[in-house]
Amino acid sequence: ENARDSLSMALYSALFGLLVDRINACLNPVDDDSGPSTRISILDIFGFERFESNSFEQLCINFANEQLQQLFTRHLFKQEQREYEAENIDWRSIPFEDNQGCLDLFQSVPHGLFSILEDEVAVPRATDLTLSDKFRALLGTNPHFCPARRTPLQFSIRHYAGTVGYDTAGFLEKNRDSLSAGLEALIEGSGHCLLP
């Protein structure tokens, strides 16, 4: 089942990349740096997710949404306000919630959620429980991280869109998510034009 899912994701990613490359080649057929080019970028993402049971997939989707929210916040509020100040434009400060702290919870090195997860994947005897214990030990004081009291595999994150509870069951296996050597050889040997 994991091999099937990994293969599906790799094929989807390759097909998606091929589609974007082909569209861009049609929009800008001349490889010329003399003028502005026409390109298209496609963002394929789910919206913010909060289900009764949330796992690694929802964590990744919600992290991507946190990044999009920060991009919006940075452009609309932070950048515009700096420009107004630089140009001495009279304006009224608009209060906004900055989600950088939540992004830091995910991205900080070495004690961000993803960094801890990557380190734990490399540990031969790591389990979902040892991962959860490391999250609690290293992230427990972060205001955006809330360890569950009664269930050791669960924690919550205070996102910009609300608090979401996650279950670490399967985090390690899903993060490994690599194609086996046999599947890679099968794809490479297929000779199909859509396969890398």
Residue map of PLM features:
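Flexible, glycine/threonine-enriched loop-and-boundary segments that flank and lead into catalytic domains
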Residues: 2-6, 10, 14-39, 116, ...
